[in-house]
Design a protein with these regions (language model features):
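Active-site segment of SDR-like NAD(P)-dependent oxidoreductases
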Residues: 4-6, 45-48
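A general structural signal for well-ordered alpha-helical segments in protein cores
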Residues: 21, 25, 53, 72-73
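A short beta-to-alpha transition loop/helix N-cap that caps and shapes the active-site region
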Residues: 49-50, 100
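C-terminal helical subdomain
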Residues: 34-37, 41-43, 55-100
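Catalytic loop of short-chain dehydrogenase/reductase
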Residues: 3-20, 26, 30-33
């Protein structure tokens, strides 16, 4: 799983680890996919709305800025139960209030 993988100014130190994470997930998916094991790579490009996160990261942001944990869990559940004929690998989640 990944928190963010897009390039961003002043975040170059973070980019190499995220690229490595994605490539590792691809390798695992190719190794285990033929055995019927679905590997998906999730990018959660958002501040996740928790009691601790909101006051620390963005106390003045509206609700639309945050990803809700139940919505993230629903999407992960949906992907985990996909038909093998239409498996997703890379799934990006972000709230509509996020600037990207």
């Amino acid at each position: 799983m990944c928190i963010r993988d897009r390039g961003k100014t002043n975040w170059g130190f973070f980019a190499s680890t995220k690229a490595a994470q994605r490539i590792l997930a691809e390798s695992i998916a190719r190794e285990f996919g033929p055995r019927g094991i679905h590997v998906a790579y999730f990018i959660i490009d958002a501040a996740i709305d928790t009691p601790r996160t909101r006051p620390l990261i963005a106390p003045d942001k509206p609700d639309e800025f945050f990803a809700k944990p139940p919505a993230i869990a629903e999407e992960m559940y949906r992907v985990a139960h996909q038909d093998p004929s239409t498996w997703s690998f890379r799934v990006e989640l972000r709230p509509f209030g996020e600037v990207w």
